[in-house]
Amino acid sequence: MAKEVFQRTKPHMNVGTIGHVDHGKTTLTAAISIYCSKLNKDAKALKYEDIDNAPEEKARGITINARHIEYETANRHYAHVDCPGHADYIKNMITGAAQMDAAILLVAADSGAEPQTKEHLLLAQRMGIKKIIVFLNKLDLADPELVELVEVEVLELVEKYGFSANTPIIKGSAFGAMSNPEDPEATKCVKELLESMDNYFDLPERDIDKPFLLAVEDVFSISGRGTVATGRIERGVIKVGQEVEIVGIKETRKTTVTGVEMFQKILEQGQAGDNVGLLLRGVDKKDIERGQVLSAPGTITPHKKFKASIYCLTKEEGGRHKPFFPGYRPQFFFRTTDVTGVVALEGKEMVMPGDNVDIVVELISSIAMDKNVEFAVREGGRTVASGRILEILE
């Protein structure tokens, strides 16, 4: 059966749900999907089980990898990524956040902000997300006085991480909306959220004129057709027949794009901001992996050593409790990859939590990088610093 062609009739935006594990991110994602399918006859309703679709996730009832769904409002087409809240899987949340233009922060009204609420806010800010909307969930389970306290606490937190004091707060029960899609009172919170997204989130300016770049998020084989790499196009456009380079981790190699798809629909051209799957000619699944990039030939090169400016999180922000010294070996997260690197300090003996410093990093493997790219630094399952590349050394 021939696939349908994706019709680009509305502006496209990437959003996602972030927040602490079990605060209701996947339930809200399902509630939105079901609500939008009622408004638009072509839309497919996805239930909770469809979004949490890996066997391990079903067993644990938590989201491990970021999941994408699509839906439309009257004014926009949204790609929605459901980010994992579980601490072990926060590196996958970084990949998800790297793909979002704006985020919906879920906070359970009956428990308030939790450690991961803060970590997700910090990561969202570092990944360049400018605006968020707060969804105060599980309203049916919370004492009204507690809800007011949680609201104040969350707004303070949102401001602390650089988001607006006028951040909208939508209150409701995602579970109620998901379970009673025909009840206008139950789905009112979803309706308000979607209206708020259309009005409050600014459509991002896309770097369509720059050379093509896509950070590979996932790779899979389609029997008889070849290998597909998926990810968000960071800049530029891509069409069938164009040559691209696979850069980073392994030897750089060239291939040709033989198919461009978004949400299982054919795209005439993929452009900056789109979450796409690209079919690649003559590439085996083992030849390409998450963390590499696909780029216009000759526009980005792999490197190991760079100078960067970093900010070290304080203990209160979930960072280290003690300083680190030359020879420190954490993981560096760029786009969709994480690589161990060794830190050298210039003219300093140590770096304290809360410091802003310049460091030199040598990674254990080469990755595609360019100046001004932002990254997160993690160790032992937590984010300890965030930074930006100042110059590439080798």
From Swiss-Prot:
Its EC number is 3.6.5.3. Residues 137-140 are annotated as: G4. Residues 82-85 are annotated as: G3. Residues 10-205 form the tr-type G domain. Monomer. GTP hydrolase that promotes the GTP-dependent binding of aminoacyl-tRNA to the A-site of ribosomes during protein biosynthesis. This is Elongation factor Tu.
